[in-house]
């Protein structure tokens, strides 16, 4: 597939519960997020997408939105905050909120569909559900996938020996890839929405 070279300038925000969970150690959180983004880049290479961590913001004093166990409400608040505050402060294409709260209904992440480059909706919410960076990378790559137009694969989807990243639930495994269906969804998103913000070089 001839997918264009795209660049996602990503901001990750770690909430106050994350700060407390990691004993107020900024370096631990930083290292973790960098490793997560490294995995995301490995997954997205097949789609010709480069993800760069433009900024990592850690809410060390307090949360700037109300983080609650309702994923829907928290995602909505985060989108509003991104549009009104974060976008004015730093140019970026997408923001992901990393929270240590336990989300309702066994939710590990939530994101808007077809929303990359949208001022309010180019966001995702990720629960810090596993100490394993690979699995966190899969979760964030999955939510970013929704932002890029990808719907869920079947629950048993495999690509060769790898588990498909857009499976509805997270199955622990050793290797993960985007399915052909995910690539087609992304191509369709590019054709329909023409997301200018990821087509420019950072």
Swiss-Prot record:
Reaction catalyzed:
Cleavage of 10-His-|-Leu-11, 14-Ala-|-Leu-15, 16-Tyr-|-Leu-17 and 23-Gly-|-Phe-24 bonds of the B chain of insulin, His-|-Pro, Pro-|-Phe, and Trp-|-Ser of angiotensin I, and Gly-|-Phe of Met enkephalin
Q: List the molecular function annotations (GO) for this entry.
A: metal ion binding; metalloendopeptidase activity; toxin activity
Question: Which parts of the sequence bind Ca(2+)?
Answer: 9, 93, 197, 200
User: Where in this protein does the record say Pyrrolidone carboxylic acid is found?
Assistant: 1
Q: How is the cofactor bound?
A: Binds 1 zinc ion per subunit.
InterPro entries reported for this sequence: MetalloPept_cat_dom_sf, Peptidase_M12B, Reprolysin_adamalysin
Binding sites annotated in the UniProt record for Zn(2+) = 142, 146, 152
Q: Which SUPFAM superfamilies match?
A: Metalloproteases ('zincins'), catalytic domain
- What cofactor requirement does the entry state? Zn(2+)
The reply on keyword Cytoplasm is no
**Which of the seven top EC classes does this enzyme belong to?**
hydrolase
Q: List the disulfide bonds.
A: 117-197, 157-164
Is-annotated flag, keyword Kinase?
no
Q: Which GO terms describe its biological process?
A: proteolysis
Residue span, Peptidase M12B domain: 6-202
- Give the multimer and partner information: Monomer.
Q: Which family does it belong to?
A: Belongs to the venom metalloproteinase (M12B) family. P-I subfamily.
| Annotated function | This protein is a zinc protease from snake venom that induces hemorrhage.
For this entry, the protein name equals: Snake venom metalloproteinase HT-2
Q: Which organism is it from?
A: Crotalus ruber ruber
